[in-house]
């Protein structure tokens, strides 16, 4: 799962089910527009492998329900990734070499067991680590910029321990008001905005929100104490 998974899968499923499971009548029905590009139901459809995998987790849901949940989640991911990328581009947010190297050193520690794995060629593994490092450093830098611009709640998520969900909400609302994206299907629309506006049970105390250093550097420092 990527850093655009703002809402945990099970919570997202609960939202969708509570709103009612309805899919567009036609498989190619246009359900949203994102930066002047139409998004059809067809392009959001999950693979059968993904349906089977998540149905093994959401055991009380039918295949149809799981497929709908994944389709709506795919739309949320597409909007999230595109809006965050646009925000980063407009604000010229890119990690510097030191930030990427810092992330790389941590990722190398996390993946040290792969060094002796014959399934991974040395050069291929290094490209993977560098790509992961760049993505992680940029994600932290975008989160930092969003929090500094909008404030709001920050929560822990597996792929981003400092996820500024309050800032996400304000950013998405601004992009919606500017017409940068619109969701036509009422159920998709309700599910997306319910997930964006979700109130988390556990949020960081404002005094403990610190973007002065990348979160992985602080974690490593704490582990060494």
Features from the language model and the residues they span:
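Short, charged low-complexity intrinsically disordered segments located at boundaries
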Residues: 77-84, 117, 135-137, 200-207
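Short, low-structural-confidence N-terminal segments
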Residues: 1-72, 166-225
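Alpha-helical transmembrane segments of integral membrane proteins
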Residues: 6-9, 128, 132
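A structural motif
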Residues: 111-116, 134-142
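Hydrophobic transmembrane signal anchors and adjacent membrane-proximal interface regions, especially
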Residues: 15, 109-112, 152-156, 198
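Acidic/polar surface patches and capping/hinge elements
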Residues: 125-130, 140-186, 196, 212
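Contiguous hydrophobic segments
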Residues: 38, 61, 92-107, 144-169, ...
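N-terminal targeting/tethering segments
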Residues: 23-130
């Amino acid at each position: 799962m990527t850093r655009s998974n703002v809402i945990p899968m099970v919570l997202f499923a609960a939202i969708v089910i509570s709103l009612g499971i309805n899919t567009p009548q036609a498989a190619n029905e246009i359900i949203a527009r994102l930066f002047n590009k139409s998004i059809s139901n067809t392009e959001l459809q999950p693979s059968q492998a993904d349906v089977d995998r998540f149905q093994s987790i959401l055991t009380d849901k039918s295949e149809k329900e799981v497929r709908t949940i994944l389709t709506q989640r795919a739309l949320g991911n597409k909007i999230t990734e595109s809006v965050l990328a646009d925000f980063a581009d407009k604000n010229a947010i890119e990690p510097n070499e030191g930030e990427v190297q810092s992330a790389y050193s941590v990722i190398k520690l996390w993946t040290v067991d792969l060094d002796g794995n014959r399934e991974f060629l040395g050069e291929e593994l290094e490209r993977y680590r560098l790509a992961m490092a760049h993505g992680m450093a940029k994600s932290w830098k975008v989160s930092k910029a969003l929090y500094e611009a909008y404030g709001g709640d920050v929560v822990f998520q597996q792929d981003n321990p400092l996820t500024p969900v309050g800032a996400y909400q304000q950013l998405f609302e601004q992009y919606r008001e500017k017409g940068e994206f619109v969701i036509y299907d009422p159920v998709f629309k309700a599910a997306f905005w319910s997930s964006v506006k979700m109130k988390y049970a556990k949020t960081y105390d404002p005094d403990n929100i610190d973007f002065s250093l990348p979160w992985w550097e602080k974690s490593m420092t704490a582990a060494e104490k």
